[in-house]
Amino acid sequence: ANMIFASIYPLYLNRLEKNGRTKEELNQVIEWFTGFDKDDLQALIKEKVTFRSFFQKAKIHPNTHLIKGVVCGYRIEEIEDEFEVYKQCRRMEKLIDELARGRKMDKILREEKTNLRSG
Protein backbone atom coordinates (compact mmCIF):
# COMPACT_ATOMS: atom_id res chain seq x y z
CA ALA A 1 0.00 0.00 0.00
CA ASN A 2 2.93 2.31 0.62
CA MET A 3 4.75 1.41 -2.58
CA ILE A 4 5.02 4.26 -5.05
CA PHE A 5 2.87 3.77 -8.14
CA ALA A 6 5.48 5.58 -10.30
CA SER A 7 8.06 2.91 -9.45
CA ILE A 8 5.79 0.05 -10.59
CA TYR A 9 4.21 1.61 -13.70
CA PRO A 10 7.41 1.22 -15.83
CA LEU A 11 7.55 -2.47 -14.82
CA TYR A 12 3.98 -2.97 -16.03
CA LEU A 13 4.81 -1.17 -19.27
CA ASN A 14 8.04 -3.10 -19.84
CA ARG A 15 6.26 -6.42 -19.35
CA LEU A 16 3.52 -5.48 -21.81
CA GLU A 17 5.88 -4.13 -24.46
CA LYS A 18 7.89 -7.38 -24.31
CA ASN A 19 4.63 -9.13 -25.19
CA GLY A 20 3.79 -6.83 -28.10
CA ARG A 21 1.29 -4.64 -26.25
CA THR A 22 1.40 -0.84 -26.03
CA LYS A 23 1.44 1.96 -23.47
CA GLU A 24 -1.93 3.06 -24.85
CA GLU A 25 -3.41 -0.37 -24.06
CA LEU A 26 -1.94 -0.28 -20.54
CA ASN A 27 -3.42 3.18 -20.01
CA GLN A 28 -6.78 2.01 -21.38
CA VAL A 29 -6.90 -0.82 -18.83
CA ILE A 30 -5.89 1.50 -15.99
CA GLU A 31 -8.44 4.11 -17.10
CA TRP A 32 -11.23 1.50 -17.18
CA PHE A 33 -10.23 0.31 -13.70
CA THR A 34 -9.62 3.70 -12.03
CA GLY A 35 -11.23 6.39 -14.15
CA PHE A 36 -7.83 8.11 -14.57
CA ASP A 37 -7.14 9.33 -18.10
CA LYS A 38 -3.55 9.58 -19.41
CA ASP A 39 -3.15 13.14 -18.08
CA ASP A 40 -4.39 12.13 -14.61
CA LEU A 41 -2.04 9.15 -14.72
CA GLN A 42 0.98 11.29 -15.64
CA ALA A 43 0.15 13.74 -12.83
CA LEU A 44 -0.08 10.88 -10.30
CA ILE A 45 3.22 9.43 -11.53
CA LYS A 46 4.86 12.85 -11.23
CA GLU A 47 3.39 13.27 -7.72
CA LYS A 48 4.86 9.89 -6.75
CA VAL A 49 1.63 8.79 -5.04
CA THR A 50 1.48 5.55 -3.08
CA PHE A 51 -0.82 2.75 -4.21
CA ARG A 52 -3.04 3.59 -1.20
CA SER A 53 -3.42 7.19 -2.37
CA PHE A 54 -3.74 6.07 -6.01
CA PHE A 55 -6.73 3.85 -5.22
CA GLN A 56 -8.26 6.36 -2.77
CA LYS A 57 -8.32 9.00 -5.54
CA ALA A 58 -9.68 6.53 -8.13
CA LYS A 59 -13.27 6.09 -9.25
CA ILE A 60 -13.12 2.29 -9.24
CA HIS A 61 -15.19 0.74 -12.04
CA PRO A 62 -18.34 -0.96 -10.72
CA ASN A 63 -17.50 -4.20 -12.55
CA THR A 64 -14.16 -4.82 -10.82
CA HIS A 65 -15.90 -7.42 -8.65
CA LEU A 66 -16.03 -9.56 -11.82
CA ILE A 67 -12.21 -9.84 -11.83
CA LYS A 68 -11.42 -13.24 -10.37
CA GLY A 69 -8.59 -15.72 -10.45
CA VAL A 70 -5.04 -16.06 -9.20
CA VAL A 71 -2.37 -13.36 -9.36
CA CYS A 72 1.08 -13.77 -7.80
CA GLY A 73 -0.16 -16.92 -6.05
CA TYR A 74 -3.16 -15.22 -4.40
CA ARG A 75 -6.78 -15.91 -5.31
CA ILE A 76 -8.35 -12.46 -5.64
CA GLU A 77 -11.78 -13.54 -4.35
CA GLU A 78 -10.18 -14.78 -1.10
CA ILE A 79 -8.43 -11.52 -0.20
CA GLU A 80 -10.25 -10.10 2.82
CA ASP A 81 -12.11 -6.80 2.39
CA GLU A 82 -10.03 -5.24 5.17
CA PHE A 83 -7.10 -5.39 2.73
CA GLU A 84 -8.97 -3.35 0.11
CA VAL A 85 -5.92 -1.55 -1.34
CA TYR A 86 -4.10 -4.86 -1.74
CA LYS A 87 -7.19 -6.42 -3.34
CA GLN A 88 -7.56 -3.53 -5.82
CA CYS A 89 -3.86 -3.75 -6.66
CA ARG A 90 -4.16 -7.48 -7.39
CA ARG A 91 -7.30 -6.93 -9.48
CA MET A 92 -5.53 -4.34 -11.61
CA GLU A 93 -2.49 -6.62 -11.93
CA LYS A 94 -4.79 -9.42 -13.10
CA LEU A 95 -6.04 -7.21 -15.96
CA ILE A 96 -2.45 -6.28 -16.87
CA ASP A 97 -1.54 -10.00 -16.79
CA GLU A 98 -4.38 -10.80 -19.16
CA LEU A 99 -3.26 -8.01 -21.49
CA ALA A 100 0.31 -9.35 -21.48
CA ARG A 101 -0.98 -12.84 -22.30
CA GLY A 102 -2.76 -11.56 -25.40
CA ARG A 103 -6.34 -11.61 -24.17
CA LYS A 104 -8.71 -9.40 -26.16
CA MET A 105 -9.52 -6.00 -24.67
CA ASP A 106 -13.30 -6.63 -24.73
CA LYS A 107 -12.72 -9.67 -22.48
CA ILE A 108 -10.34 -7.82 -20.16
CA LEU A 109 -12.69 -4.88 -19.56
CA ARG A 110 -15.41 -6.80 -17.75
CA GLU A 111 -19.07 -6.29 -18.53
CA GLU A 112 -22.01 -7.61 -16.52
CA LYS A 113 -23.75 -10.43 -18.34
CA THR A 114 -27.44 -9.75 -18.73
CA ASN A 115 -29.97 -12.50 -19.10
CA LEU A 116 -32.30 -11.53 -21.88
CA ARG A 117 -35.29 -13.77 -22.10
CA SER A 118 -37.71 -13.42 -24.93
CA GLY A 119 -41.26 -14.09 -23.89
Identify what each model region corresponds to.
Residues A1-G119:
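A charge-rich, low-complexity, intrinsically flexible signal that marks solvent-exposed coils, linkers
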